[in-house]
Amino acid sequence: MGCHLIDPPFKTVGLGYPSEVECSMSSTYHEMWNALDHPDSCPVSSSVKMKFPGKPGKPDVDLHWMDGGIRPDRPEELGPDEPMGDGDGGAIITGTKGKIMCGTYGHRPTLLPTSRMQGLNVPQTLARVPEGHYVQWVNACIAGYGKNQLSSPFEYAGPLTETILMGNLALRSYNIKDVTGKQFPGRKKLLWDAVNMKITNFDEANQFVKREYRPGWKLGI
């Protein structure tokens, strides 16, 4: 769900690549003191924090991801009986002049407090995709690269996907143990070099960044 929930702040703020990531996640036990470890599947719940370098003249931006039933604190501007997001989740963007809340897929963007929405008429500036993104994708393939205007071209979707994978990278590193089996050196703030696509302060995490493909299946990147 990361692509659907992180897309609104990623697109509107123009985040780019994160420079650091850290996380915490739940543990499950099959008996006393023996935690289950299933590194190839997601945890029951997790919390991830990323930092994005600020644009010229603007501060850095922190992005917080929560799942598995973990929710952020309710904004003070939101009434006690007003819904936060929607049934599947949502996003809250906090700026210097206020907050905006939306549901999953960016549905129903709302200024907070919600009273600020009264009488508000925001003009539509982004092109809509009435045929749906499946048809848009097929039409773009038929037309050829660069011929059609897309709502999520590779130039945008690539950095967005890399951002979400940074969260997975932190989660995979979280339970790496040292030689004693008692310490977890990956439970730190991981520093990301986006140009060279590597973690600079915990080399063991880089095993999850790239892989060696079988002969004949190598990617051209």
What are these regions (language model features)?
Residues 1-153, 159-221:
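Glycine-rich, aromatic-lined ligand/substrate-binding cores of catalytic
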